[in-house]
Amino acid sequence: MYYPFVRKALFQLDPERAHEFTFQQLRRITGTPFEALVRQKVPAKPVNCMGLTFKNPLGLAAGLDKDGECIDALGAMGFGSIEIGTVTPRPQPGNDKPRLFRLVDAEGLINRMGFNNLGVDNLVENVKKAHYDGVLGINIGKNKDTPVEQGKDDYLICMEKIYAYAGYIAINISSPNTPGLRTLQYGEALDDLLTAIKNKQNDLQAMHHKYVPIAVKIAPDLSEDELIQVADSLVRHNIDGVIATNTTLDRSLVQGMKNCDQTGGLSGRPLQLKSTEIIRRLSLELNGRLPIIGVGGIDSVIAAREKIAAGASLVQIYSGFIFKGPPLIKEIVTHI
């Protein structure tokens, strides 16, 4: 397959520049006959989850296509679902560059992007142009300059604007790169947020005559007690699903490697065991009351199977996709 040669060239570039270059090419072909250049035929393996039918259990995790610019080109590669975002109500530049780092030996990434995106209105316009026939998730967050105490307002603004166009909505309260965001995972702050989100979901369902499920994305760095509390809150508020997990602040598996001390969230292979353990513990706690979407370090069929064995109904890839390319999609969907 050609991807090892493509990767070698891309890895000569700064990580963010490589991403920008790749997306520049994908934008050129998305929605055109040239999508055939990236199209892969993958077997149909339907999965019912959150009241939706997914063509296959493998999705693209949020963060790669933040603004929904390349939905059709990515869909042509065989993903059963694509999660775009994280998007915020207003455009924001994110954190200062450099903010994305490769740990090549560990096949990991560290990012401190900071929800750089062009805003929810721009994303909606891109979604309207897309023809992807899989499940489209839209991941939403708060603007950096919105006080945490008012953070729920940003989620509600985004929900209102994307509801008509989303297959499901992902609530990102677990990025380590927006100051104070992870505090929304705990106690009264979480209950307050989930109450507001559920009420808004009910209002929007009545308005649009369709039910769009809500999934909450959690961190891998939760303690046992925190995980129990999160699970309890999700069940009490009738949330439709949970995405486990986001990136980690833990560096124990990458000590001594180049870039290991960079600030930000670590993803890729070093996250695999940690995220799988969270899924296993979460699955025991939830006992089937809501489905888990497993993400974190999946870079092989074995890693995907481990997530499902731990309790995930669906899985997503991001860093593994960067390191292994489109062939990983076909490999996982075919053999999972």
UniProtKB/Swiss-Prot annotation:
<comment type="function">
    <text>Catalyzes the conversion of dihydroorotate to orotate with quinone as electron acceptor.</text>
</comment>
<dbReference type="Pfam" id="PF01180">
    <property type="entry name" value="DHO_dh"/>
</dbReference>
<feature type="binding site">
    <location>
        <begin position="246"/>
        <end position="247"/>
    </location>
    <ligand>
        <name>substrate</name>
    </ligand>
</feature>
<feature type="binding site">
    <location>
        <begin position="318"/>
        <end position="319"/>
    </location>
    <ligand>
        <name>FMN</name>
    </ligand>
</feature>
<protein>
    <recommendedName>
        <fullName>Dihydroorotate dehydrogenase (quinone)</fullName>
        <ecNumber>1.3.5.2</ecNumber>
    </recommendedName>
</protein>
<dbReference type="InterPro" id="IPR001295">
    <property type="entry name" value="Dihydroorotate_DH_CS"/>
</dbReference>
<dbReference type="InterPro" id="IPR005719">
    <property type="entry name" value="Dihydroorotate_DH_2"/>
</dbReference>
<keyword id="KW-0665">Pyrimidine biosynthesis</keyword>
<feature type="binding site">
    <location>
        <position position="172"/>
    </location>
    <ligand>
        <name>substrate</name>
    </ligand>
</feature>
<dbReference type="InterPro" id="IPR013785">
    <property type="entry name" value="Aldolase_TIM"/>
</dbReference>
<feature type="binding site">
    <location>
        <position position="245"/>
    </location>
    <ligand>
        <name>FMN</name>
    </ligand>
</feature>
<keyword id="KW-0288">FMN</keyword>
<feature type="binding site">
    <location>
        <position position="217"/>
    </location>
    <ligand>
        <name>FMN</name>
    </ligand>
</feature>
<feature type="active site" description="Nucleophile">
    <location>
        <position position="175"/>
    </location>
</feature>
<keyword id="KW-0472">Membrane</keyword>
<feature type="binding site">
    <location>
        <position position="172"/>
    </location>
    <ligand>
        <name>FMN</name>
    </ligand>
</feature>
<feature type="binding site">
    <location>
        <position position="86"/>
    </location>
    <ligand>
        <name>FMN</name>
    </ligand>
</feature>
<feature type="binding site">
    <location>
        <position position="139"/>
    </location>
    <ligand>
        <name>FMN</name>
    </ligand>
</feature>
<dbReference type="GO" id="GO:0005737">
    <property type="term" value="C:cytoplasm"/>
</dbReference>
<keyword id="KW-0560">Oxidoreductase</keyword>
<dbReference type="GO" id="GO:0006207">
    <property type="term" value="P:'de novo' pyrimidine nucleobase biosynthetic process"/>
</dbReference>
<dbReference type="InterPro" id="IPR005720">
    <property type="entry name" value="Dihydroorotate_DH_cat"/>
</dbReference>
<comment type="similarity">
    <text>Belongs to the dihydroorotate dehydrogenase family. Type 2 subfamily.</text>
</comment>
<feature type="binding site">
    <location>
        <position position="177"/>
    </location>
    <ligand>
        <name>substrate</name>
    </ligand>
</feature>
<feature type="binding site">
    <location>
        <position position="268"/>
    </location>
    <ligand>
        <name>FMN</name>
    </ligand>
</feature>
<feature type="binding site">
    <location>
        <begin position="111"/>
        <end position="115"/>
    </location>
    <ligand>
        <name>substrate</name>
    </ligand>
</feature>
<feature type="binding site">
    <location>
        <begin position="62"/>
        <end position="66"/>
    </location>
    <ligand>
        <name>FMN</name>
    </ligand>
</feature>
<dbReference type="GO" id="GO:0044205">
    <property type="term" value="P:'de novo' UMP biosynthetic process"/>
</dbReference>
<comment type="subunit">
    <text>Monomer.</text>
</comment>
<comment type="pathway">
    <text>Pyrimidine metabolism; UMP biosynthesis via de novo pathway; orotate from (S)-dihydroorotate (quinone route): step 1/1.</text>
</comment>
<keyword id="KW-0285">Flavoprotein</keyword>
<feature type="binding site">
    <location>
        <position position="66"/>
    </location>
    <ligand>
        <name>substrate</name>
    </ligand>
</feature>
<keyword id="KW-1003">Cell membrane</keyword>
<dbReference type="InterPro" id="IPR050074">
    <property type="entry name" value="DHO_dehydrogenase"/>
</dbReference>
<feature type="binding site">
    <location>
        <position position="297"/>
    </location>
    <ligand>
        <name>FMN</name>
    </ligand>
</feature>
<dbReference type="GO" id="GO:0005886">
    <property type="term" value="C:plasma membrane"/>
</dbReference>
<dbReference type="GO" id="GO:0106430">
    <property type="term" value="F:dihydroorotate dehydrogenase (quinone) activity"/>
</dbReference>
<dbReference type="InterPro" id="IPR012135">
    <property type="entry name" value="Dihydroorotate_DH_1_2"/>
</dbReference>
